[in-house]
Amino acid sequence: KDFYVYYARMIETNKYLNLTGITDMKEVVVKHMIDSLSCYDSEIIKSGMTIIDVGTGAGFPGIPLAIYDRSLKVTLFDSLKKRLTFLESVIDKLKLTNCTILHGRAEDLSHQDYRESFDIATSRAVARLPILLEWTVPYVKEGGYVVALKGAIYEEEVKESNKALSILKATIEEIR
């Protein structure tokens, strides 16, 4: 039910605020909801973990993760206040007390308070992997994870990421 309420609110808001080009319910379920939940791995994600969803946009994957596992503490991070206003309305409607929002740009040093504060950083369709790593790794605690939901053509981005991985003292553990 919560996933449908989220979908309906997104489609209604999409009439005046461009949140997604995909509006057909079946396509939204497959391309947004299921894709977002594909990063949920119970071997990595444990009860009560903190997640920052960098460049959350319409809330993917953060909102589906927060609905699926209400023990997670999810911070939805985006640079566009209008999108965050939409997400606040979803959070209120669904009573997602495990969600908060953060306004700003990931690359800004003004978010020093949030550095190394999260168990996991997620991001979907935001930037090429080398840039994405620079924007997400600093927010993750030592021993934490960055989950980058990338498309089918990711190999080149992985190769381009070696310098960023070295500078950030990070490694790629798994690719699925």
Where are these regions (language model features)?
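S-adenosylmethionine
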Residues: 72-75, 79-176
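Residue-level signal for inorganic ion chemistry
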Residues: 10, 65, 150
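Conserved beta-strand elements of the Class I
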Residues: 52-54, 120
